[in-house]
């Protein structure tokens, strides 16, 4: 991928997330895009199909509600130190790579229903409200750290 193509993808992603593109960095060695310290006003887990994305210390102001309709996510999901101000609801997603959601704060509901996790997953966080993994299927290790 050329620098122009990378810059175009970063701008496209920043526009979709409704963030300042200065919060977005590309790591060519890891072939990934990192979003650092952004205030995010639009989001979908489907983004992980197109990019290897990592979110660090971001604030999500939007509800994340992946409506019923099965889809697969090929790339890893990495979300560290983020705050979710609205509900995070996920239905029928098959996560085919690692899922790491670490040291995040969920100020409303965190609800995963009928998802499949095909690889090792780490959920290191505190729950301040309601959390449910109803009918979710984990094919490999799942670790909860410091959960209350």
Give residue spans per PLM region.
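N-terminal leader/targeting and pre-domain segments
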Residues: 1-148
């Amino acid at each position: 991928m050329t620098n122009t193509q990378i810059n175009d993808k970063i701008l496209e992603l920043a526009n979709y997330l409704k963030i300042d593109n200065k919060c977005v960095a590309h790591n060519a060695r890891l072939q990934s895009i990192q979003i650092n310290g952004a205030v995010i006003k639009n989001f979908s887990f489907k983004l992980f199909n197109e990019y290897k994305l990592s979110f660090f210390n971001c604030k999500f102001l939007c509800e994340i509600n992946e409506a019923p309709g099965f889809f697969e996510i090929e790339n890893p999901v990495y979300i560290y130190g983020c705050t979710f101000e609205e509900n995070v609801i996920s239905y029928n997603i098959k996560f085919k790579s690692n899922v790491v959601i670490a040291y995040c704060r969920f100020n409303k509901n965190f609800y995963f229903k009928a998802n499949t996790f095909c690889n090792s997953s780490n959920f290191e966080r505190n729950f301040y409200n309601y959390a449910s993994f109803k009918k979710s299927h984990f094919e490999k290790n799942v670790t909860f750290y410091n959960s209350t």
